C-alpha cells in the first residue's frame, strides 16, 4: 500500500521531469526514524546515470511530488528523499489489519502464474531425515507465500520408483521377510539395503500376507518369478511412500500431486522428445544415447538412454519437466539438496530445448541441518541407527520450533540447531518470543472493551517505537511480495521477529489499559493490528499463533 503509493508518486515525477523511468531504485524504512518513515535512493541512482548532483535531482523530484499525500517530504544527504506518513495513511494500514482473516493484496491477474513446486522427492527406499525436513519446510512455505500473492500453486513429489535401487530395496525386504519367518537360506547382497527400513516393510508384509511368499525363489540376487517380483517391488515402494506421507503429515506437509517416474517412462514421453525437440541435440555412442549438454555450458555430455536401452534418471527428469510444462505450468520450481548443484545447468539446458522458457525453470538449493544437544551433534537415530528421522527430530523439538529454526537462515547456509535453546521459555528462544507476543496481545484484548474507531487519534502514536511499528505494519506486504520473487523466506521470519522485539519494548514501557480513553483506544488499535499480522505471518510458515502460554 504505502510502497505502491510512494513508487507511483516517484514514477509520475520522473515522467514530468523527462528523467529515465527504467531505473531500479529502492524504497525502504528509514534506519533513523528522525529522518522520516520511508526513504528512496532514486536521486542517487539517477545521479550516476545523468552525471548530476543527487541533491539537485532530489530537489527537482520533491517539487513534483504531491505534498498533500504525506505529512511531509524532505531531503537528507547524500541523496535520500524521505517520506513522513500522514495520519490518514497510518489509519488505512491499521484498519486493514483489524480483520482477523487478513490477506495480502494479490498480484494483478496478468501477473498471476500457475506454478509447480517440486520438493522432498526422496527415493522410496528409506525414511526421511533432517535434510529432507528442511527441504519440505522450504517447499511448503514457499507454496504458501506464492499462493498468498495470487499464484496458483501445485506441490508435487517426484517418486523415483524406476531402476535398480527400488529393485534392490524390494529384494532386501523379501530376504528380511523370509528371515522374520525363520527362513535363513538367503543372505543380503553387499550392495543391498542393510538398514532397518527393509525390516519395517518386512513386518508389514507379514501382517498383510502372512507366510504367502515363504516359498519364493531367489537366484543371482533376483526374484525368479518376474510377475511376483514386480508385484512385491510395487508393494515395497507403496509401503515406503505410506511411511513418507505419514512423516510429512506429522510436520504439517501435504503434497497435492505424487508423480511416478515409472509412469512417466511408460508414457513414452522421453521417446517423443528424442524424436522431436531433442533430435538435433543427441548422438549415439557406445550403444548409449547422449545429449550434447556441452552446448549449454556443461563440462561433458550426458547419457539419456543407457546401453541396456533403459533411461537414466536425467532422461526421465527431462520428460518429467516437459510434462509439467504441457500440464500448463508457467514456472517450475525445484527444491533440491545442495549436493545436486551440478545438475542445475544441464537440467535447465534440457528444459529450454523442450520448450520451457529461460528463467521459468528454477532451483532452490538447500544446505544440510545438524541438531546439537549440550554442544554436541546428535548423529544417530534411536529408531533407525543412522540418520535422524522425523519421529526422532520431534522428540527433541516441536513442529513449530523445527519450522522456525530450519527457515530463519538463508537456504545457502548450513544450519546447526541447539535443541536446548528451542525448548527455552524466554526471550532467547525466538519462537517462544514471537508466540508470547501474540498471546500477550490476545490477553490484553480480552481485558479491553471493543475498539472505538471514533476515539482513535493517530497523532498520539508519536514515540519512535510506535512510529517504527506502524512502519513495519505498512511494509510487510512489500516483504511478502518480495519473498515471492526471491524465495528468501528467512527474511520474513526476521521481519516478524524484529516487529516482535519492538512490540515487547513498547508493551513494557507504555501503559495501555489504564490511560485516557483516546490513548487507550489508539494503542489498542495498534496492538490488535500487530497481533493479526503476527498471526498471518506465522500462518504462512505453518507455525501456531498461540493465545495462551
Swiss-Prot record:
GO terms for molecular function: arginine-tRNA ligase activity; ATP binding. It is found in: Cytoplasm. It catalyses: tRNA(Arg) + L-arginine + ATP = L-arginyl-tRNA(Arg) + AMP + diphosphate. SMART domains: Arg_tRNA_synt_N, DALR_1. A motif ('HIGH' region) lies at residues 122-132. NCBIfam families: argS (TIGR00456). Belongs to the class-I aminoacyl-tRNA synthetase family. This is Arginine--tRNA ligase. The lineage of its organism: Bacteria, Bacillati, Mycoplasmatota, Mycoplasmoidales, Mycoplasmoidaceae.
Amino acid at each position: 500500500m504505502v510502497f505502491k503509493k510512494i513508487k507511483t508518486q516517484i514514477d509520475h515525477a520522473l515522467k514530468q521531469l523527462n528523467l529515465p523511468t527504467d531505473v531500479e531504485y529502492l524504497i525502504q524504512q528509514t534506519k533513523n526514524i528522525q529522518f522520516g518513515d520511508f526513504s528512496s535512493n532514486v536521486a542517487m541512482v539517477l545521479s550516476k546515470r545523468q552525471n548530476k548532483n543527487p541533491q539537485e535531482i532530489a530537489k527537482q523530484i520533491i517539487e513534483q511530488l504531491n505534498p498533500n499525500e504525506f505529512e511531509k517530504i524532505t531531503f537528507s544527504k547524500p541523496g535520500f528523499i524521505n517520506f513522513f506518513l500522514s495520519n490518514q495513511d497510518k489509519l488505512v494500514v491499521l484498519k486493514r489489519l483489524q480483520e482477523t482473516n487478513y490477506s495480502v493484496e494479490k498480484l494483478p491477474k496478468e501477473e498471476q502464474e500457475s506454478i509447480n513446486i517440486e520438493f522432498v522427492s526422496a527415493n522410496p527406499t528409506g525414511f526421511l531425515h533432517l535434510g529432507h525436513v528442511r527441504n519440505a519446510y522450504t517447499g511448503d512455505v514457499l507454496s504458501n507465500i506464492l499462493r498468498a500473492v495470487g499464484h496458483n500453486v501445485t506441490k508435487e513429489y517426484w517418486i523415483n520408483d524406476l531402476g535398480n535401487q527400488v529393485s534392490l530395496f524390494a529384494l532386501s525386504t523379501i530376504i528380511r521377510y523370509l528371515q522374520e519367518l525363520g527362513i535363513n537360506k538367503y543372505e543380503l547382497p553387499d550392495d543391498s539395503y542393510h538398514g532397518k527400513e527393509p525390516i519395517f516393510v518386512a513386518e508389514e508384509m507379514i501382517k498383510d500376507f502372512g507366510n504367502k511368499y515363504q516359498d519364493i525363489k531367489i537366484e543371482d540376487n533376483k526374484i525368479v518369478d518376474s510377475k511376483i517380483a514386480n508385484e512385491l517391488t510395487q508393494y515395497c515402494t507403496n509401503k515406503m511412500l505410506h511411511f513418507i506421507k505419514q512423516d510429512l503429515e506429522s510436520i504439517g506437509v501435504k503434497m497435492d500431486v505424487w508423480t511416478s517416474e515409472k509412469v512417466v517412462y511408460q508414457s513414452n514421453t522421453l521417446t517423443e522428445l528424442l524424436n522431436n525437440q531433442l533430435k538435433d541435440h543427441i548422438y549415439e555412442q557406445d550403444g548409449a544415447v547422449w545429449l550434447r549438454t556441452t552446448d549449454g555450458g556443461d563440462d561433458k555430455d550426458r547419457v539419456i538412454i543407457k546401453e541396456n536401452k533403459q533411461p537414466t534418471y536425467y532422461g526421465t527428469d527431462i520428460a518429467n519437466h516437459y510434462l509439467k510444462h504441457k500440464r500448463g505450468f508457467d514456472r517450475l520450481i525445484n527444491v533440491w539438496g545442495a549436493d545436486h548443484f551440478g545438475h542445475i545447468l544441464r537440467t535447465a539446458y534440457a528444459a529450454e530445448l523442450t520448450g520451457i522458457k529461460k528463467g521459468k525453470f528454477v532451483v532452490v538449493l538447500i544446505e544440510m541441518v545438524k541438531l546439537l544437544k549440550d554442544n554436541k551433534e546428535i548423529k544417530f537415530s534411536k529408531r533407525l541407527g543412522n540418520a535422524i528421522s522425523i519421529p526422532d527430530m520431534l522428540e527433541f523439538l516441536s513442529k513449530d520450533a523445527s519450522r522456525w529454526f530450519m527457515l530463519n537462515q538463508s537456504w545457502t547456509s548450513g544450519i546447526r540447531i541447539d535443541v536446548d535453546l528451542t525448548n527455552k521459555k524466554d526471550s532467547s528462544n525466538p519462537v517462544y518470543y514471537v508466540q508470547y507476543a501474540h498471546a500477550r496481545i490476545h490477553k490484553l484484548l480480552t481485558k479491553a472493551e471493543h475498539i472505538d474507531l471514533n476515539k482513535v487519534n493517530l497523532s498520539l502514536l508519536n514515540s519512535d517505537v510506535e512510529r517504527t511499528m506502524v512502519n513495519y505494519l505498512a511494509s510487510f506486504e512489500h516483504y511478502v511480495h518480495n519473498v515471492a520473487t526471491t524465495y528468501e523466506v528467512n527474511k520474513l521470519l526476521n521481519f516478524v521477529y524484529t516487529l516482535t522485539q519492538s512490540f515487547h519494548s513498547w508493551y513494557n514501557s507504555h501503559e495501555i489499559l489504564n490511560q485516557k480513553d483516546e490513548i487507550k483506544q489508539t494503542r489498542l488499535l495498534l496492538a490488535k493490528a500487530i497481533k493479526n499480522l503476527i498471526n498471518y505471518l506465522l500462518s504462512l510458515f505453518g507455525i501456531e499463533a498461540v493465545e495462551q502460554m
